[in-house]
Structure formats: C-alpha cells, structure tokens
Amino acid sequence: MSKYFEKVSKIKYEGPKSNNPYAFKFYNPEEVIDGKTMEEHLRFSIAYWHTFTADGTDQFGKATMQRPWNHLTDPMDIAKARVEAAFEFFDKINAPFFCFHDRDIAPEGDTLRETNKNLDIIVAMIKDYLKTSKTKVLWGTANLFSNPRFVHGASTSCNADVFAYSAAQVKKALEITKELGGQNYVFWGGREGYETLLNTDMELELDNFARFLHMAVDYAKEIGFEGQFLIEPKPKEPTKHQYDFDVANVLAFLRKYDLDKYFKVNIEANHATLAAHDFQHELRYARINGVLGSIDANTGDMLLGWDTDQFPTDIRMTTLAMYEVIKMGGFDKGGLNFDAKVRRASFEPEDLFLGHIAGMDAFAKGFKVAYKLVKDGVFDKFIEERYASYKDGIGADIVSGKADFKSLEKYALEHSEIVNKSGRQEMLESILNQYLFTE
C-alpha cells in the first residue's frame, strides 16, 4: 500500500515513443546486451541524502521541499519515516542500489554514544527492509563535514580531539556499512584541505590523512569488511583547496603513502568540471591507471562556479562516460550513483521520480551508443593509425626502450624533414554526432 508517494505507480519501460513522464523511454532493465541485462551493466543507485534529506534550503532562502514527513517534529520519527519512504521509492523506481552517509539515515544526538544508539535503531529498521527488497547498499560513508566540530577538517584537523572523534565516527560507519551489506565505502574529504597556508602545516595534515586511511584499512580487515575503499576527488567547496583535488592528485597521494593497493576512486561529474577537467578525462585517467571504482552520476552548470549536483541529461556526456566504463570491462563493485538533487523549485514529491527517470534514461541511452562505438571500433581504429609510427622503425625502438638520446639524435640528423598528419578532430566529432543521432 502506497503511503508516501501515492500519486506515482511503479515506473515501467514504455519505449522512446511514450508520452508518459512516469515511464522509462530508454532504460529497459531487463534488456540483454552482450550477455548482461541493462540493470547489471548500469548498476543504478539512489543517493539517500539528496533524495530523502535535502529540503531545498540555500544560503538565500528557507526550505521549499514538500515531503510527506514534514509534519513530524521528532528527529527519530522523521528518520523512521524516511526509511519507509525510501524503500517505497526504491520499489517504485526499481532501484538496484542506494548510498548513504551515516548522518543521512539517523540524527546526531547530544553525545557520540547517543548518536550511535540512534544509528543502531535505524540500521535495524533498514536491515528488515533489505530482507524483502531487491535494493542493496552500493556504498556507505561518514559525514565528516557538516558538524561545526569539523571546521578545521576531520583527519586533517589541527585538533587531535577532532581526529579521534572522526576515527570513532568512521569506525561506526564501517561497521554499519558491513552490517547492511555495502559493496564499497567512500571517503570524501569536504573539509580535508585549507583556506590559507599562513596557518597550515600541510605536511602534517597530509601525513595524518594517510595515517587515518591506514587505520581504516586495518579496521576493515579486523571486522572482515571486504568492500572496495573509494576516495572521491573534488578540488574545492566547501574548502578553498581540498587535498583530493582530482584523480591525478589522489593517485599521487595514494602511491606516496602506500595506500594504492587498497583504494580506487569514485568520480563525480560535477567535481571533474570544478577541477577544470572533462568528466571523460577523469574517467580515462582513472581507467588507464586501474583505479576507476565507481561513479557519482550528475552534472553541473557550466556557467556557475559551484557544485550544482543536477541530474545528468546530456546524452553526449553519458555516452563518453559509459565509453570509459565499457572499455574498462564494466563495473565490478561500483555503479552509477545519482548524486543529484532536484532543483529548489522542483519541490513536489513526484519531482524525485521525474529527476531519476531523466538521469536513468540518459545513461541507458548513453550506454547503448557507447557500446556501439566500442563494438565498431570507431575511435580505436583512428587512434591506432594515428600512432602507427610507434609500431616499427625508430618508434618501435622508443617504445621497447632500445633507443637513447644518442641514437635518436643520429636518426634526427638523418631525417631532417618531419611530416605530420591531421588530427581530424572535426571529423571525429561529426562521427560521434552521427552515432548519437542514429543509434
């Protein structure tokens, strides 16, 4: 019996000609492509925070979201209602996974002990729902940024008491993620950075960040948590300069501190653009370095300089993103988590469904186009030809390590005329459009 979303029935696939806004046009979860269903390929996940806890408040105005639990006043009653609403939502939109922060699902108490007690009550409730729901936990994480105690950071705080509290909070978050069957655990350092170097010991902060992550690895082993650890890069906001700036930055950090064997990255589209990178750039860099773990599927507004967390509807973007996932061989434990929120003016409960339908359709269509691009080898063939000079002759000597500066100088002196070929960017973009518009 519907209790929270009475106006919405189960969302079904009706095809691209459907005029029903509450139906999938391109996402058919049961459609089989290359031996796997679309549901298995895409591994969609619902973000608990944006979907069930966000209220539309911004720095200029109060809450706008109309939610069926808004009449409640007790924080625990609200938390319980959100769990009920969440699983009704998961069922109606046929979501395979969801993700959560610890403070999304249960309110903070006056003490850490009271907060953990609140978590235990809500986690027990979620476990009961998981017994009969198809929806599972993609990943869990700890909110180490909202409370004022994290004003100077969490594991990178100048205050050792905050470091200790953060460790206790992550310890509990790891325990409940394991208890709920989470397949990954994410670290996003929203406050792990600085505003000015005039008061910052960067070396100590980075060392402490690494110590913290090693402690997490050790505790995960101790409790038998076998999920994948993920770090989510973001260059700024809320901190001016965050230590997990982009994939390359994170990878250098992990390698320096001997953490690369334990961590992969969770890449968010809007974070990539804040770092002045294409989404595909971050995915490609992670893929070729073997650290692409999971994706936060959203998009930003290119005219705004902050994290807008909009639902992804650009087919070109989703195609190029899924191109990288397919080239990787698909997701293992990761997936596509909609770290996206409806706009402040899209305040009715039904808008939650409409936003997710738009995002799921966009990635389903993008996957199909990307699959055809990979299968046809469109870009691979061109790239192989473009770099053909490294297949034999002096190029082969360079790649094999046979060449050195002396031999290369000798070659250059004997071959003074260099002939380059066109990169054909415009042609390739036209081919991409051809696939986008016809597939």
Curated annotation (Swiss-Prot):
The EC number(s) this enzyme carries: 5.3.1.5
Main location: cytoplasm
GO MF annotations in UniProt: magnesium ion binding; xylose isomerase activity
InterPro entries according to UniProt: Xyl_isomerase-like_sf, Xyl_isomerase-like_TIM-brl, Xylose_isom_bac, Xylose_isomerase
Cofactor detail note: Binds 2 magnesium ions per subunit.
Keyword Metal-binding: yes
Compartments reported by the entry: Cytoplasm
Chain sites annotated for binding Mg(2+) 1: E232, E268, D296, D339
Catalyzed chemical reaction(s): alpha-D-xylose = alpha-D-xylulofuranose
Enzymatic class: isomerase
Gene Ontology terms describing biological process: D-xylose metabolic process
Active site (record annotation): H101, D104
Coiled-coil regions listed in the entry: none
Cofactor(s) needed for function: Mg(2+)
GO CC term (a single one): cytoplasm
Origin superkingdom: Bacteria
Family statement drawn from the similarity comment of this UniProt entry: Belongs to the xylose isomerase family.
Subunit structure as annotated in this protein's UniProt entry: Homotetramer.
HAMAP family in the record: Xylose_isom_A (MF_00455)
PANTHER family hit by this protein: PTHR48408, XYLOSE ISOMERASE
Name of the protein in question: Xylose isomerase
Gene coding for it: xylA
